[in-house]
From Swiss-Prot:
Subunit structure: Homodimer.
Species of the source: Clostridium acetobutylicum (strain ATCC 824 / DSM 792 / JCM 1419 / IAM 19013 / LMG 5710 / NBRC 13948 / NRRL B-527 / VKM B-1787 / 2291 / W)
Cited HAMAP family: Asp_tRNA_synth_type1
GO CC terms in record: cytoplasm
Protein name: Aspartate--tRNA ligase
Coiled coil: none
Pfam families tied to this protein: GAD (PF02938), tRNA-synt_2 (PF00152), tRNA_anti-codon (PF01336)
Main location: cytoplasm
Amino acid sequence: MGESLNGLKRTIMCGEIRENHIGNRVVVMGWVQRKRNLGGLVFVDLRDREGILQVVFGEEINKDAFMKADLVKSEYCISVSGTLVKRESPNPNMPTGMVELKGEEIKILSESETPPIYIKENLDAAENIRLRYRYLDLRRPDMQKIFKIRHKTTKIIRDFMDEENFLEMETPILTKSTPEGARDYLVPSRNYNGKFYALPQSPQLFKQLLMVSGYDKYFQIAKCFRDEDLRANRQPEFTQVDMEMSFVEEDDVIELNERLIQKVFKEMAGVEVKLPIERMTWKTAMEKYGSDKPDLRFGMEINDISEAVSTSDFKVFKSAIEEGGSVRAIKAPNSADMPRKKIDKLGEFVKTYKAKGLAWIALKEDGIKSPIAKFLKEEELKAIIDKVQGKTGDLILIVADKNSVVFQSLGALRLEIAKELEILKDNKEFRFVWITEFPLLSYNEEEERFQAEHHPFTMPMDEDIEYLESDPGRVRAKAYDIVLNGEELGGGSVRIHDTALQERMFKVLGFTKESAWERFSFLLEAFKFGPPPHAGLAYGLDRLIMFLAGTENIKDVIAFPKNQNAFCPLTEAPNVVDENQIEELGIKVESKEEE
């Protein structure tokens, strides 16, 4: 049985001790990192949240403490009282390496079994083991460093928002299901039989209502939930830095958030973000990078070579252009000698993005090598090379298809080649860009209807409103995403604040007036009472912390994450519940038949 503290108080954290503390009598508490018995001396590395301190116990210092210290094992939780002295053999690799503690008294607060994972930095352990014993995984110094970064970052954000006169307000977790996009997590109501709450995918509607309520500037570090198929770096529950402002336009939101980004990255990463941050329209991003979240740390831009081959007899190019598509290319530098097998692999890669194939032209020392050269005139080949600014040693990769396929496949290929050529290896740059003027709507061919690109409350650009019903695909949105190194960090928009325009939007999305009012009556009703123009933005806090902590795994920045199957190996949630609980809810559970 562990000893109790009996009024003993810790006086300093292990990792905070430095040379200027030598001579002080201290009380430290923590976990045994390791123990070494060197005959007449026992050395214990004691670890707490702030770091590791070497403690030495000896018969000459205190015999009882020495004998007791010899009993401790890895991960025992102990307290030690004693005097700090200069270390005889300093360790310059440790912040506390010039000092050690002479242990005069020790208490074993609790014992530990042999841990199933090592408590050390850079642990190479299976993810399911780490998640199963997450409380041990979180003891590791590199994990604790991440959560200090998370804490400090949210504090900087809160302080900044407070200085900018924002109010931190909480919005409901149990709310109404308004499905449009990802699936809601549903919570059955015991009091209202057959009815359900939904967990919020974002605080979107409530923050708009707060603007109608006259709160002017709102923010929240908000928990959000989406019941969607998990891709890499997605979690069913995640955290947003959410904000909304009244009487503002797009530029106001962008300007404020640029200053916030600048502050966070200066204080947390020591990086000076130059303002204003570059802006790029969605159309330009797609045409140049094949993505609405372009990674601008490297070039390899997409080039439209349709004009260069517009009179070509090569059937693949000709039919793509005739059918309203295009022929576009990227240039892989110094890759002309890429093995044919690798090029064929890249051809298979673009097919996963619905491209029919990949044409290529290698600019070798001894001339041009290409399976399509025989189909192209000499001047067409020259025009292609000129358009992509090709030089000897380069490899030109070409896709011909409808524009959406060309953009998607070449955008993905651009990133794949950058990975293959290790273009971004050891690149520590933070490259921001705002993407603006998104399409307001996109056509869902399966459902045969238009759907909102962001959400149905986004304001169309003023000059495009007239096309809302007649040509919905043409309408651009007052929407903006902040992108960092090819990842969407956050997104926002100016909101519709007019009932009539909001009803028009719902109609284009396929809602009847009745169904729109049934789902969103509380918002539409509120818009009858003088709503202000308003706009906002939300960041993915987890993704922001990933950048600041230098990890590519979202599970590293969430204390208790789910695995790739939305399952918690630690608590085994989701799990079965008592039959009584289910009966109270008026729910009948049927087994899903295996497909």
